[in-house]
Design a protein with these regions (language model features):
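Positively charged n-region of N-terminal signal peptides that target proteins for export
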Residues: 1-5
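Bacterial N-terminal signal peptides
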Residues: 7-16
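Non-catalytic cap/lid and distal C-terminal segments of serine-dependent acyl enzymes
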Residues: 20-290
């Protein structure tokens, strides 16, 4: 009994120590008086050639400063609803409003796209989720979806830049590895990546990326990796270890990268609160280069 009581006491005293940090949003993640607000348009995409039969919601954020006569930078967010939601983990539209107004980042259109689902053919049946196939697979299929399916649809209404330095990607978990895969497959089209708690584990072979990065000539990609010490450890792999391996491989090969390790779990709390700084870093020299 004494051992049990002692163990319980140790556990109770240890829990506050390992409690996850209470990450706080900065003023950049809240609406500010006098800052022009962009508009958000919700759409549905249901005519994919790359993923036939899928249906997905997506949202377009258009900043107040958008000029249709100028090719405009853009960022594609995987699991888009989580990023665009007013009370989501990132509040990206508000952050865009503030940083664009402060001229800390270029004028950017946000494209927030959800993973596809395949509607059930049975009445009352549940749709089949296509997320892991789209996000965790290591090939060019999702990049082709963006380049051949979705972006041409967006370009019907908006003037998107063709400059790969102005085309960026962001995602969380499987969406994070997806963002990397798109840039890895098509660095001629996308060269900026932000990954929250990226799933560089063996869901569909993503654990191979560190070795691939080390053995492949450096590609012109800039990447920000965020991870948490208390992230997942399961049959697919260990997320903190996988992201450390990614960071080590990027360093070895000479990539322009930044790696931030917090103490968070498998969620967007840490990444969401530092998103403004992620944007500042990823876009830090874009206007100067123009």
């Amino acid at each position: 009994m004494k051992i049990l009581v002692t163990s319980f006491f140790i556990l109770c005293t240890f829990l506050p120590f390992v409690a996850l940090s209470d990450y706080k949003y900065t003023e950049d993640s809240f609406p500010k008086d006098g800052v022009p607000k962009g508009k958000i348009i919700k759409k549905v995409f249901a005519k994919s050639k790359i993923y036939p039969g899928t249906v997905r919601d997506y949202w377009i954020y258009v900043p107040d400063q958008y000029n249709s006569e100028k090719p405009t930078c853009f960022m594609v967010f995987q699991d888009g609803n989580w990023y665009q939601a007013a009370k989501g983990h990132t509040r990206a539209p508000v952050v865009f409003d503030n940083l664009i107004h402060q001229k800390e980042i270029p004028v950017i259109i946000g494209i927030f796209v959800n993973p596809g689902v395949i509607p059930s053919k049975k009445e009352g049946g549940k749709p089949r989720k296509n997320r892991s196939l789209e996000y965790d697979t290591l090939n060019d299929q999702y990049s082709r979806f963006l380049l051949e399916d979705l972006l041409p649809e967006v370009e019907k209404d908006y003037n998107l830049t063709k400059d790969p330095e102005g085309r960026s990607l962001c995602g969380i978990s499987s969406g994070g590895i997806c963002a990397w895969t798109v840039a890895w497959e098509r660095p001629d089209q996308f060269r900026k990546v932000i990954s929250y708690i990226g799933s560089f584990t063996n869901i569909r072979g993503g654990h191979a990326y560190p070795a691939m990065i080390r053995k492949t000539e450096k590609k012109p990609i800039r990447v920000f990796l965020q991870e948490g010490e208390n992230d997942l450890d399961n049959l697919h792999g260990n997320w903190p270890l996988a992201n450390r391996q990614m960071a080590a491989a990027l360093k070895f090969t000479g990539y322009d990268y930044k790696f931030v390790m917090g103490d968070g779990a498998h969620n967007g709390k840490h990444g969401g609160t530092i998103f403004p700084d992620m944007l500042r870093w990823i876009w830090r020299d874009y206007e100067k280069a123009k």
